[in-house]
Amino acid sequence: MKQHIETLHLETIVGGGQALGTLEKGKKAFVWGGLPDETVKIRVTKNKSRYVEGVVEEVIDSSKQRITPKDPDSYLSTSPWQLMAFETEQHYKAALIEEAFELHNIVLPDTIEIYTNGLEYGYRNKVEFSWYGDTSGSVETLDIAFFRRGSKGKIPVQGTSLAHPRINELALKIRDLLSSKNVEARSLKTLLIRCDQTGSCVWQLYIKENLPDVITPDEAANLPAQGGEVIYSDPKSPASRITDRLDSFGDVVLKDELRGTTFRYACEGFFQVNLPIYEQSLRDMAEGLDDKP
């Protein structure tokens, strides 16, 4: 299929980290991998009547704000903000918050400040990896991967700089274990790993086929994790949906303390991915409650 390429000038940043520009015929373009004041060539990934979406293929005139992403091959799959300095990211996010209030005719009394604990990388406590198998060689490879933004393709990775290091370490251990047992990517759906604030991890391996002893109790005990599960997930659904819990090893319940209260939660459950920042938001909200129940 022939690629649809457009050249345009980018004007601003919108929510989520896309840059916004206008095509020659007047249609708006929401672009991944671009910055304001850049002229770029984009590959159109979605073409609607009033707008297009696309991914930067070539930067013709680069912004002074552009930096080399920490994860150059996969950053668009995890955090499109990596192509700018942390201070620039904070500036744009503050401006987007202010703009959101202005759309509702609300003028904030004070300048917006974005709170940070200074951790740019290694802070996320949950990552969901896909799987990728290269069948071009004599032996099929097995890699953890992310979906490529704007396509159905996948990007093999060694982890992500945003995740707690223990998550990346565990993901590679599980990959190597499955590879040593000749497990093929087509039989696997996803690998979900979550850790608490001490770095203790729980994993869930979602599979699409019946794989007896894909991970044995002894193998699970040798992984750098407090526990894990093997889960059959309906292959008709792309989501990591729990159809049947096949095996469970160790302790699969994570535990964290926030403002003196202990929370226990499952690997697959919804919980904040950056607990120190979430805890600060709780402090801020508590200040406005005036000791009310």
Where are each of the predicted segments found?
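Accessory RNA-recognition modules of RNA-modification enzymes
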Residues: 1-293
